[in-house]
Swiss-Prot record:
Species whose genome carries this gene: Chlamydomonas reinhardtii
Chain intervals for the UniProt region annotation (Disordered): 1-40, 56-106
Main location: plastid
Gene3D superfamilies in UniProt: Pseudouridine synthase (3.30.2350.10)
Protein name listed in UniProt: Trans-splicing factor Raa2, chloroplastic
A GO cellular component annotation in the UniProt record: chloroplast
Top-level taxon of the source organism: Eukaryota
A Pfam family matched in the record: TruB_N
Length: 410
């Protein structure tokens, strides 16, 4: 047995392309198919320190950490030419079994990362099968005063799915389109975040609030004058925001790489107050957050504003301030004309439509619009109508969806 093994290796050594050198033959035997126990050479990225003043050096110094490379650079310091840090592929030795394990892990990660187009759930009970719930998307029309976790929990209980997530969150007081992803479709979150989203709603011009919303306790309906603004002023201010986001050299614009817009994004500061909803209630309160100087990039593709005909008394918190004046008018006048004027003029209510890319900062956009008009502005009502190519008209109303899911899912 030893003779055959010796003859075999001797024959391989004699016919090796490396010649009769012992070190070359040994290196050739390490890479032979029959010697799997020997380590194999592979290439890794390391930090290489080169000294241009010493070109006669045999090999550059190599380090795997930045700190060690800097220490070696100080040792190689030269007055004429400073050392340079550059990445370089170097050889290392790992076993073939470890190489196979690494290849299998890379292949498994590639297979898991390959996103299969999910099924849009449109009919019941056909789209409630396990294979659909493992990779599906459900369009939901969220009513106001519903938290996103409440919507996700209600749908998950009704369908019995293992994994449900909302890839496009929405404020509790806002209504409109939500995307609920089942199973592996939750990998769509980065793509949905980069998609364009359209919002519609109303804003109160002249009113101010710490949170930028009329539901906050600090809201004042007519803090600054806004009745003198004409329709032309409103259109020019809205078009000015779109022009600034489209590439005009204005203060506060930074470059971004989105393909859908003009290539620039408005940079805004986050608010130090946010609006929170009381548990199991439709009331809200303002909560102070830690101030931050981190700016938020907001890409604006379209922004249109038009005047509302009149402000109803039951529409939001802006009209609630005038209910007491109307009641006092009926008690005193008994049908006669009340000569007293309210303590503040009525705020200007406008309708708007905005198309944003990335994470939505509608309150910051409304506040920025008010500053361009030399007044204040607060968000009154908000509804999301589009996410990419999805429209709210194709979504299921939540009040009608949950009973249907409970009836067909189990």
């Amino acid at each position: 047995m030893r003779t055959r093994a010796g003859a075999f290796f001797g024959k391989q050594r004699s016919t090796s392309p490396s010649g009769s050198s012992t070190s070359a033959s040994r290196q050739w035997l390490r890479s032979s198919p029959g010697r799997t126990q020997r380590p194999a050479a592979h290439r890794v990225l390391a930090v290489c320190v080169r000294n241009p003043a010493r070109p006669a050096a045999d090999h550059p110094l190599v380090s795997t950490t930045q700190a060690a490379a800097q220490r070696q650079a100080r040792q190689w310091d030269s007055r004429s030419k400073p050392p340079q840090l550059q990445p370089q592929l170097r050889h290392t030795h790992v076993s073939r079994q470890a190489q196979r394990r690494q290849q299998q892990q890379v292949q498994q990660q590639a297979e898991a990362g390959a996103l299969v187009v999910p099924t849009v759930i449109t009919s019941f009970p056909e789209h409630l099968r396990p294979e659909v719930l493992a990779n599906g998307v459900l369009l939901v029309d969220k009513p106001p005063h519903w938290e996103v976790p409440e919507v996700v929990a209600a749908v998950q209980r009704a369908t019995g799915a293992d994994k449900v997530a909302s890839v496009a969150p929405l404020d509790a007081r806002a209504s409109g389109l939500m995307l609920l992803c089942f199973g592996s479709a939750t990998r769509l979150a980065p793509r949905v975040e980069r998609a364009a989203k359209r919002y519609t709603g109303t804003l109160v011009l002249g009113g101010s609030s710490l949170s930028g919303d009329v539901r906050g306790g600090s809201f004042r309906a007519a803090q600054l004058p806004a009745e003198h603004l004409t329709d032309e002023d409103l259109r020019e201010a809205a078009q000015g925001l779109v022009t600034a986001a489209a590439g005009a050299p204005v203060h506060g614009a930074v470059a971004t790489g989105h393909q859908g817009g003009g290539g620039l994004a408005l940079r805004v500061l986050p608010r130090t107050w946010r609006l929170r909803q009381l548990p199991s209630s439709t009331e809200y309160y303002e909560e102070r957050v830690e101030p931050s100087m981190r700016t938020l990039d907001m890409e604006l593709l379209d922004f249109r504003v038009w005047r509302e005909s009149a402000l109803s008394h039951n529409d939001g918190a802006a009209g609630a301030e005038y209910d007491q004046h109307d009641q006092h008018k009926q008690e005193l006048g008994r049908g006669l004309v009340w000569t007293r004027s309210p303590p503040h003029p009525r705020p200007v209510v406008l309708r708007f439509s905005a198309l944003l890319v990335g994470r939505s900062h509608v309150r910051s956009l409304i506040a920025m619009y008010g500053r361009r008009l030399r007044t204040a502005a607060c968000l009154d009502d908000l509804r999301r109508t589009e996410i990419g190519s999805f429209n709210v008209e194709e979504a299921w109303p939540l009040e009608a969806l949950v009973p249907v899911l409970q009836r067909h899912a189990h």
